[in-house]
Curated annotation (Swiss-Prot):
SUPFAM superfamilies for this protein: PLP-dependent transferases (SSF53383)
Protein name per its UniProtKB record: Histidinol-phosphate aminotransferase 2
UniProt entry keywords in alphabetical sequence: Amino-acid biosynthesis, Aminotransferase, Histidine biosynthesis, Pyridoxal phosphate, Transferase
InterPro entries tied to this protein: Aminotrans_II_pyridoxalP_BS, Aminotransferase_I/II_large, HisP_aminotrans, HistidinolP_aminotransfase, PyrdxlP-dep_Trfase, PyrdxlP-dep_Trfase_major, PyrdxlP-dep_Trfase_small
Organism of origin: Carboxydothermus hydrogenoformans (strain ATCC BAA-161 / DSM 6008 / Z-2901)
Pathway: Amino-acid biosynthesis; L-histidine biosynthesis; L-histidine from 5-phospho-alpha-D-ribose 1-diphosphate: step 7/9
GO annotation, biological process: L-histidine biosynthetic process
Catalytic activity: L-histidinol phosphate + 2-oxoglutarate = 3-(imidazol-4-yl)-2-oxopropyl phosphate + L-glutamate
Assembly behavior: Homodimer.
Length: 362
């Protein structure tokens, strides 16, 4: 009954929701530091826009999201015809595979990385070529060597999730020189707003504007704080954007999401404050982790990987009992690591205190 390509696919398992932990463990006062969300919340301008829009949710949204596309186009100096929108950027990851992968075609991707690349390629009866990281970074040399006549698509997560490491401008330029122009290279920049603090971090939009078949994906879920509304966006060549617009569901970005995203783009000062606070939070966590005698991977995103020297599933469960939700590294093949979202000062301090207690008993 079910297509063969779907037989071994497993549903994506996100970070545990607060409500689920409350039900399972009967505890309250929970801090979710598992899903790389903006723990500072939404801007006042976004809150006001949502409040104003609520009275209009009885109408269908604009399927073409005209206002939002115009806003993004004006901000980034592209045409609306280059913009693709999704119910989160993960939907755009899927749309790209749907638009480009025929049975037997290949797509190249790093591993561990964002876990939706492989399933969507497999779903289309494509072949996912997963290239392991090298010292926690994308192995661009091996990825370039893996390109062949069957390669249609390359996914580059920059900064990479879960490691937080990033490709530099020079590294990306060298990689793109080695990849044939007919191969679509996707720069997944979900954490762009945080990574641009680094001088050698490449703005994918510059490469989109000068290299054919380059796609850039971004999201309102992270720095903008709209994870619950699900709105991702991207920049694609016009013919590819047209194909994606043809295959997407009619109203894939809902009305509240569109209005919130438009308002979010009007409050860049708030985003800068979130990025500044996150950077300060990371520095605090780095300092405390070193004091504990542990190691970490320096991150260009709003999360970091910490090497606990203990089985990650055990550390995860013990922190969970104490009301702190993190991500267990074993799901990424990093068994003695955990991934933690950078939170508010209170949340960061609580996490460090709870981690100290957990490691003392394990």
């Amino acid at each position: 009954m079910v297509r063969k390509a779907l037989e071994n696919l497993k549903p994506y398992v996100p970070g545990k929701p607060v409500e689920e932990v409350e039900r399972e463990l009967g505890i309250t006062n929970i801090d979710k530091l598992a899903s790389n969300e903006n723990l500072w919340g939404i801007s006042p301008k976004v809150a006001a826009a949502i409040k104003e829009a609520v009275d209009k949710v009885n109408y269908y949204p604009d399927g073409g999201a005209f206002r939002l596309k115009e806003k993004i186009a004006a901000k980034y100096g592209v045409t609306p015809d280059n913009i693709i929108l999704g119910n989160g950027s993960d939907e755009l990851v899927m749309f790209l595979a749907m638009a480009l992968i025929d049975p037997g075609d290949e797509a190249i991707m790093p591993v561990p990385s964002f876990p939706r690349y492989e399933p969507v390629v497999t779903m289309m009866n494509g072949i996912a070529r997963e290239i392991p990281l090298k010292e926690h970074r994308l192995d661009l040399k091996t990825m370039a060597e893996a390109v062949n006549e069957k390669t249609r698509l390359v996914y580059l997560c920059n900064p990479n999730n879960p490691t937080g490491t990033y490709i530099t401008k020079g590294e990306l330029e060298e990689f793109l020189e080695r990849v044939p122009e007919e191969v679509v290279v996707v720069l997944d920049e979900a954490y762009f707003e945080f990574a641009r603090l680094f001088n050698d971090y490449p703005d994918g939009l510059n490469f989109f504007k000068k290299r054919p078949n380059t796609v850039v994906l971004r999201t309102f879920s992270k720095a903008y704080g709209l994870a619950g509304l699900r709105v991702g966006y991207g920049f694609a060549p016009e013919n590819l954007a047209k194909a994606i617009n043809s295959l997407r569901p009619p109203f894939n970005v809902n009305f509240l999401a569109q209005m919130a995203a438009v308002a979010a783009l009007d409050d860049e000062e708030y985003v800068r404050e979130v990025v500044k606070n996150t950077d300060e939070g990371k520095k605090f966590l780095y300092q405390e982790i070193i004091r504990m005698g542990l190691s970490y991977i320096p991150s260009a995103a709003n999360f970091l990987m910490i090497k606990t020297e203990k089985p990650s599933a055990l550390v995860f469960r013990e922190l969970l009992k104490r009301g702190v939700i993190v991500r267990s590294g074993d799901i990424f093949g990093m068994d003695d690591w955990i991934r933690v979202t950078v939170g508010t000062p209170v949340q960061n301090a609580r996490f460090i205190n709870e981690l100290k207690m957990v490691l003392e008993i394990l």
